């Protein structure tokens, strides 16, 4: 997996990302265009109008992130609107038209810390678009995350020990002035605690479309289950655990209807809770949970199967909060294509300390 270290001003960070991942970003854009056109059935002119509005909102409300997007576009030699599209793809594909995708996420508190993880399931073709980013910024924790090339926030953790996961939800609707999901993920990744991440996202005044974000460290974890008109907070159960898949667990507004989630979302949720009941608390056992193939191919470890399952688990990430490290398995955990561990050095730890001051 391509690994890019980005540092400096927001524009410089974006430029390094864009120039190093130029070819991969081109593939990400091609995929996003096909996905959005297929999901929304809207004309190019209608999509252009929505994209223009979302771009203006990002520029006005989060100029730092817009500068990074502008830097990516410059480095990748693409139009800024194309990078805006990548970073608002959820709002297009899920806000304008209910879509169906799967992921499984879990957090488990232990006597000496916590373990947190996710299987990220999506269309198999996007695996080649995944990259690994390390971003160093003055006054903020260093962040390390796995993302699709061109997208500024996704699944990862920071040198303050805050880890972030992301699941699709199926509440239709789009509020163009709300926070795009990938901007919210970046806000969480730049926070010094789960509580701060939750507060900072809520303070933005609402989300643009529906999704679920889990934020955890060694001491606490929260889930943000949101739609364009509501944000609900998921907390740990009596056993210090939290599990989420791709259906709503919390009550939203009476006019907000969940539209046809994947039936296996309930199966995966129940299966993960069942597996955690027998979990012995070791990292090795936690890692094995993500390779579970019960109800194959619609299992926690999802598999592509022609005519049945259109997606697959493209990567698994496990955060060991006691060790302050994350293990990534690219591909299905049963037979990964690549495995690596992400850690922070002393310089990164100092950045986290300074961010707390």
Curated annotation (Swiss-Prot):
It is found in: Peroxisome matrix. One of its GO terms (molecular function) is isopenicillin-N N-acyltransferase activity. Keywords: Acyltransferase, Antibiotic biosynthesis, Peroxisome, Transferase, Zymogen. 6-aminopenicillanate binds at residues 121, 310. GO terms for cellular component: peroxisomal matrix. Belongs to the peptidase C45 family. This is Isopenicillin-N N-acyltransferase. The lineage of its organism: Eukaryota, Fungi, Dikarya, Ascomycota, Pezizomycotina.
């Amino acid at each position: 997996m391509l690994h890019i270290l980005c540092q400096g001003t927001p524009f410089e960070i974006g430029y390094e990302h864009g120039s190093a991942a130029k070819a991969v970003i081109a593939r990400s854009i091609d995929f996003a265009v096909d996905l959005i056109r297929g999901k929304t059935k809207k004309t190019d002119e209608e999509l252009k109008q929505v994209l223009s509005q979302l771009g203006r909102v990002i520029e006005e409300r989060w100029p730092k992130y817009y500068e990074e997007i502008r830097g990516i576009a410059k480095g990748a030699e693409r139009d800024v609107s194309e990078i805006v599209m990548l970073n608002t793809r959820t709002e297009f594909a899920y806000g304008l038209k209910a879509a169906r995708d799967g992921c499984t996420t879990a957090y488990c508190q232990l006597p000496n810390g916590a373990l947190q993880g996710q299987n990220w399931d999506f269309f198999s073709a996007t695996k080649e678009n995944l990259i690994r980013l390390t971003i160093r910024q003055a006054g903020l924790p260093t962040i390390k995350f796995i993302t699709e090339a061109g997208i500024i926030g996704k699944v990862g953790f920071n040198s303050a020990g805050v880890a972030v996961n992301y699941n699709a939800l199926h509440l239709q609707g789009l509020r163009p002035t709300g926070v795009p999901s990938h901007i919210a993920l970046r806000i969480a990744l730049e926070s010094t605690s789960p509580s701060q991440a939750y507060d900072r996202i809520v303070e933005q005044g609402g989300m643009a479309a529906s999704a679920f974000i889990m934020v955890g460290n060694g001491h606490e974890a929260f889930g943000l289950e949101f739609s364009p008109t509501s944000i609900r907070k998921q907390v740990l159960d009596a056993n210090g655990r939290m599990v989420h898949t791709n259906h709503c667990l919390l009550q939203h507004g009476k006019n907000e209807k969940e539209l046809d989630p994947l039936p296996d979302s309930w199966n995966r949720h129940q299966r993960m809770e069942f597996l955690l009941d027998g979990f012995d608390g070791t990292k090795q056992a936690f890692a094995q949970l993500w390779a579970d193939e019960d109800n194959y191919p619609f299992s926690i470890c999802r598999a592509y199967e022609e005519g049945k399952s259109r997606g697959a688990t493209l990567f698994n990430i496990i955060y060991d909060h006691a060790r302050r490290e994350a293990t990534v398995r690219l591909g299905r955990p049963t037979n990964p294509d690549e495995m690596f561990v992400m850690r922070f050095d002393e310089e990164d730890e100092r950045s986290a300390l300074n961010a707390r001051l």
